[in-house]
Each structure stands twice: as structure tokens, then as C-alpha cells.
From Swiss-Prot:
FAD binds at residues 8-37. SUPFAM superfamilies: FAD-linked reductases, C-terminal domain, FAD/NAD(P)-binding domain. The keyword Oxidoreductase applies. It comes from Rhodococcus erythropolis. This is Uncharacterized GMC-type oxidoreductase in thcA 5'region. Its cofactor is FAD. GO terms for molecular function: flavin adenine dinucleotide binding; oxidoreductase activity, acting on CH-OH group of donors.
Length: 493
């Protein structure tokens, strides 16, 4: 067996988590680490295309070379398309640089080994916070975190903050504090007007290590097993299938691709696998189930007078966070941010951050190269529909207050099911499709050490394992999970 087709640790997916895991594992010079990425790869930050470092543009449009796109069913009556990162750094390399952590309360329903006090050291290890120095913030981590200066805020962001305070909502000075609640500035993984993904912050500084190898442009089609032990993967490389062997396979392909890879490998609900002609290795009912995201309804607003697009303005500078809701005053239309999308209004996002509805990711065919069947089952629960309307009312009231300043016209909002569903979208915060839980839980896929239950030599490290979706965007939490999982894999925990 040659060096080219073997590694001690084989990391599948060079997205947000995969870049962290590969960089941290390769800190052990005695371990060989190989990272496989389906999209584009770069040897240094100097090679990075400008659009991947520009936090004011979102290269996720229909013609983007940096994303995978998937057809999805948001509701039985509303189809859509989602985009996932297809480059080193993954979706964190193409998003709006929102870097809020999960709150202390979010971890109360996680396994006991993953409570807030257990994970705080890894949040801190991941970051250099440029605005706060306290026991809750890191000062020497790979990801810089900063908030937009008050005097540089877009007018809408400033008026939104003032309107929310005027409505009686608390001033949320530090949104990465453990019990964050209220209105305040959004933490961003940005430094010097540059989006710092985990590819830039973690992976590229490690590429000089002789024990770390990165292959880009290769698609993993299945995990290879000997019995129930993972011994490698099959990849599609320039149209040819190639096998790479490993002592330990770590799947970091995200909440869509990870369950899809497992299902194609024979790990998942036995009945579903049999229907598609896939041989069953492990009957794990939870693979692809419990899929959850943050549903979002966009309420339109219009500036009272035409305004020039501000070229260096983050898409989201302030936000209102409540127990189960997030209200997002976007500073620009997504038409101006995302190349190739249809004309859209400026909007304020009303987002359910603790939805009860759950969806699924299943095999649509036995072809590993085919797209999975993705059903969101959005707003199926009565609770979600009521919470959504509560959020819409709050957002409408805030827009009315902003309109009184003359900045925007008065909003026009309808509350019919048809109007709401026509504006329903997703935050692209996919989670939960291979959840972490107790071995006795038939729907758990990994244990509290990120090991696939019933398998050997196989771990999952990405947002698919989150037991519950955070009430904040998952990016910062994903980095924390990858930091802690790396420590577990290295035997430091």
C-alpha cells in the first residue's frame, strides 16, 4: 500500500469542521492525516479567489462554482433549492460571516458531557475576540471575531437597534455571552474586511506539515467496511473510482452530505436501504432523520428614497434574539449580494430558532452520485405556525417604528397562510440528521465522543450530530464541536 492511498486519519469533507479537524489532528507529528474535499482547493490564502474572502458578497448563486445545489421540499406545496459550500472552508467560506455562539440554555438538552461549561474552553480556543476580554472570550484562536463599529453601521441597522430598544427589548451588548438575549451587534468572523473561514484560519497555516495531505476535486461515494469497521473510502476522481484506506474515517461533510454518504455506504434505516438496493452494514434508524433548519420568512421593506448600495457593509450587522425567534434587518437585497438570483425586495428576516417541525434526508435512488431526497416539513407544527406569526408581528411593529423616522416606507405585511408560505425560505443552518445521543436511543447515530454507534473506526464531526439545533446560527458552534472532537480523537479528553 502506498502513502498516496493510506492515512491514519482520513477526513471526509473540507468544510467548516473538516478544516479544523485536519489542522488539529496534524498537530501530532506521528499521525498521518488526509483531507478530502469535493470542491476547489488552495495551497495558501494568496491563491484564494477574492470572492471567497469578501464578506460583503455571497457567492452562492445558481451558477456558483463554490457550491453544491440541491432541490428540496420546504412544505408539500413549496419547492426550493438550497446551496452548500463546495470549497475548502465549506459553507463558512461563502456565507455572511455571522459568528454567534449557541447559548448556555441550548446545551441543556445535549448529552451531559456537552454542557456549556464543558464546551466553553473550545469556544474560547477557536477565537480571537477583538472587542471583548472576559472569561467567556478567547484571545489567541484562529478565527477573529469582531462587531461592526457603531459609527459605521448601515442606517437601517442603527434605526433597527433604536426601535427595538424603544419597544422595550434588552440591550444585548455581547451576543456571544452565555445568556445572550435582546438586540445588539452581530459577531462576525471578519478581519480587515476579509471573511476568515476555517480554511484560512486553521487549515492553510498547517499545510506545510509533512504529515498533512489535502486532495481537492474528489467526491467520496461510500465508506468501505470490513464487517462493521470502517477501513477507508471509495472516491470518484476524474471519472475513476479509487480506494483510500485509513485507520479512522472522520466524516465532516455537513448535515446534507454526511447522511447521504452513510446511506450510500449501508449505514441507515435497513428498510430504506433495501428499497434502493444498498447492502445493510448497520441498521441505524436515525441516519437522515431529525433533520432541522431555521425557517425564515422575509418581510419586505422599501427605502423612502433611493439609496446607493454600500459596497463594504455586512449583510447583517444587528439582530434581535428572543427565546425562540431571531429578527434580522438585512442591509441589502439578496439580489445585490448573490449573483444570478431573481429580483428580491429588501427584507427583514423573521426566523424560528427553535422549530418543532422535523424533516428528513433519504436516498432518492441507489446511485451514489444522485442527489438525496430532502424534505423540510417546515411549519408543520401548530407551535411553529404560532411562533412565526408572533415574530412577524414583532418585526412589523419595528418596521413601523423605523418608518416613522422617514428612512423606509410603511411595511405591507399579510398574515394569510398563502402570503407567508410564498415568502418562506430557509436560513441554510442544516442540523440534526445524524444526532448525538445515548447508545440506547434507536435514533442516535453517534455517541458523546462522536463515534458512530455500532461501528468501529468511524466518527462524524459536523452539524449533522447536533442533538438540538442552536437558537443561533450554527457556524461558531460547529467550530467548537470540531475543536472538541479533535481533542477527543487525539486522546486529550
Amino acid at each position: 500500500m502506498t502513502e498516496a492511498d493510506y492515512a491514519d486519519f482520513l477526513v471526509v469533507g473540507g468544510g467548516t469542521c473538516g478544516c479544523v479537524v485536519a489542522a488539529r489532528l496534524s498537530e501530532d507529528p506521528s499521525a498521518t492525516v488526509m483531507l478530502l474535499e469535493s470542491g476547489s482547493g488552495y495551497r495558501s490564502a494568496l491563491e484564494l479567489p477574492d470572492v471567497l474572502g469578501d464578506p460583503y458578497r455571497l457567492p452562492v448563486g445558481p451558477a456558483s462554482e463554490y457550491t453544491w445545489t440541491y432541490p428540496v421540499e420546504l412544505t408539500p406545496r413549496r419547492a426550493s433549492t438550497i446551496a452548500r459550500g463546495r470549497t475548502l472552508g465549506g459553507s463558512g467560506a461563502v456565507n455572511g460571516a455571522y459568528f454567534m455562539r449557541a447559548t448556555r440554555a441550548d446545551f441543556e438538552n445535549w448529552p451531559s458531557a456537552w454542557r456549556y461549561d464543558d464546551v466553553l474552553p473550545y469556544f474560547k480556543k477557536s477565537e480571537t475576540d477583538r472587542d471583548f476580554e472576559s472569561e467567556f472570550h478567547g484571545t489567541a484562536g484562529p478565527i477573529p471575531v469582531e462587531r461592526r463599529a457603531w459609527d459605521q453601521l448601515h442606517p437601517l441597522s442603527g434605526e433597527f437597534h433604536a426601535a427595538a430598544l424603544g419597544a422595550g427589548f434588552p440591550d444585548d451588548v455581547d451576543k456571544n455571552a452565555p445568556d445572550s438575549f435582546g438586540v445588539g451587534r452581530v459577531p462576525l468572523n471578519v478581519a480587515d474586511h476579509r471573511r476568515i473561514s476555517t480554511a484560512i484560519g486553521y487549515l492553510m497555516p498547517a499545510l506545510h506539515r509533512p504529515n498533512l495531505r489535502v486532495e481537492s476535486g474528489v467526491n467520496v461515494i461510500r465508506i468501505v467496511f470490513s464487517g462493521t469497521r470502517a477501513v477507508g473510502v471509495d472516491v470518484l476522481d476524474d471519472g475513476n473510482v479509487r480506494r483510500i484506506h485509513a485507520d479512522h474515517v472522520i466524516v465532516c461533510s455537513g448535515a446534507v452530505a454526511t447522511p447521504h454518504i452513510l446511506l450510500n455506504s449501508g449505514v441507515g434505516p435497513a428498510e430504506q436501504l433495501a428499497e434502493q438496493g444498498v447492502s445493510v452494514i448497520l441498521d441505524r434508524h436515525g441516519v437522515g432523520q431529525n433533520f432541522v433548519d431555521h425557517p425564515e420568512v422575509l418581510l419586505p421593506y422599501h427605502f423612502s428614497t433611493p439609496r446607493a448600495i454600500r459596497s463594504q457593509t455586512p449583510v447583517l450587522e444587528t439582530a434581535l434574539n428572543l427565546a425562540e425567534l431571531e429578527i434580522r434587518p438585512y442591509t441589502a437585497s439578496f439580489t445585490d449580494l448573490v449573483p444570478g438570483v431573481p429580483r428580491m425586495d429588501h427584507g427583514v428576516g423573521v426566523v424560528l430558532m427553535a422549530p418543532r417541525s422535523r424533516g428528513s434526508i433519504e436516498l432518492a435512488s441507489g446511485d451514489p452520485a444522485g442527489a438525496p431526497r430532502i424534505r423540510y416539513n417546515y411549519v408543520a407544527s401548530t407551535h411553529d405556525r404560532a411562533a412565526n406569526r408572533e415574530g412577524m408581528q414583532i418585526a412589523e411593529n419595528l418596521l413601523e417604528s423605523i418608518a416613522e423616522t422617514g428612512l423606509i416606507d410603511r411595511p405591507v405585511v399579510e398574515y394569510t397562510d398563502e402570503w407567508v408560505e410564498s415568502r418562506l425560505g430557509t436560513s441554510l443552518h442544516m442540523s440534526g440528521s445524524c444526532v448525538m445521543g445515548a447508545e440506547s436511543d434507536p435514533f442516535a447515530v453517534v455517541d458523546d465522543r462522536c463515534r458512530v454507534i455500532g461501528a468501529q473506526g468511524l466518527s462524524i464531526v459536523d452539524t449533522s450530530i447536533l442533538p438540538t439545533i442552536p437558537t443561533r446560527g450554527p457556524h461558531a458552534t460547529a467550530v467548537m464541536v470540531a475543536e472538541r472532537a479533535s481533542a477527543i480523537l487525539l486522546g486529550d479528553e
